[in-house]
Amino acid sequence: MSSPLLDLEPRLLWQHFDGIRQIPRPSKHEEKISEHVENWASERGFEVRKDEAGSMVISVPATEGRENAETIILQGHLDMVCEKNSDVDHDFMTQGIEVEVDDDWVRAKGTTLGADNGIGLAAAMAFADDPEVVHGPLEILATVDEETGLTGAKMLDPSILSGKILLNLDTEEDGAIYMGCAGGADTDAFMRASRRRGLLGSVPVKLAVRGLRGGHSGLNIIENRGNAIKLATRVIQAALYAGIDVDVVSIDGGSKHNAIPRECFAVCRLDKGALDEFRGVAAACATDFHEEFDATDPDLEVVVEEMDDDEATRRVLNIHARDRLLRLLDSLPHGVLSMSREVPGLVETSANLAVVETQEDGLKFVTSHRSSVMPALFAVRRSVTSTFRQAGASVSYDEHYPGWKPNPESPILKRTADVYERVFGEQPEICLLYTSDAADERG
């Protein structure tokens, strides 16, 4: 049966994408798509170079008369995100993607389409194939494992490239040119905490801060959305300041390093006679929180629920551990730390208190930081490390992603924008990404 993509324009682009979408290419399993691209290059006499990670560079000779032009690198990645609906029977390791054309949209049937970044790879191949395109020397850089680890970008052997100008073909918005991106780093910690039995006459309660919007710690950090961990900490501290003797059994909030926590749950113990007063403090805090965050988190709620008294809720943090924990959560930075001095409206540096998880012998913390200026990124990491260590926590680091500092005066940016306006009759939108995954690939 003929593919519905083959009649679409521009034909070369869709012909290449049609070939790509039929090839299984999960992250870390790019062998078949790599072979497909390599065969395409060999059939045309293009030189192919590979590095140890499996990324490849295809050298495309210049058209006649353009041999002395600068080499341009066209970059994309070979793998795709593999997700399917629960009612779809599909094996991404052995099957290609079934597609349909719905008006102006190309869609997959119950699975991800793989246009990220199959369409970018197809565009580079079509560009090299089109006899009417006049160009200088080209290098098509196709990296591996972008979606699950950026392995190809991080392990790229620069010796397989000769060009100095790179155009990344893995973006989402029509009419947008991206000129910079934040780098990122995670700082994790573990704080040991001793326990004791709760006081006689005390009862367990669950404090829930929920209903917040959360969101991506890069894209949404500028909106100043509430952090449920921070807010739950404030409720407990407010109760202590009000003279209520609150013991903490556990605090758990957040789930992912790159997400703003939407919920946080704290199990506490307090004297039964102080329960109404504690509820009053929580209600007052909720009023304050709505005054601060109603524009971003209108569904925020603070709830106090009584719990069954059992052995698990009777083992509370000792007072020293409780106070260290609350001071730590209160002190860890969260939100926008600085705005760019060069690009109006751009977040330059931020921090995200992402996860707190109570374990038997202590508490685990996950924090993430972003900046388009690498010295600022490492300064935040050092500051967060100092805060953890002052609380007696041990610290560990994940690998950082390098940032890509924006340069509004970049000659290639200006040339690209001029060409876009000449071809499409309108000015492109010049954008910046505040997510770290793209920085590693483009920077």
Give the predicted meaning of each segment.
Residues G136-A228, L240-Y241:
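Fold-level recognition of mixed alpha/beta catalytic cores in primary-metabolism enzymes, strongest
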Residues S338-Q390, S394:
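Non-catalytic terminal/interface segments that mediate subunit docking, oligomerization
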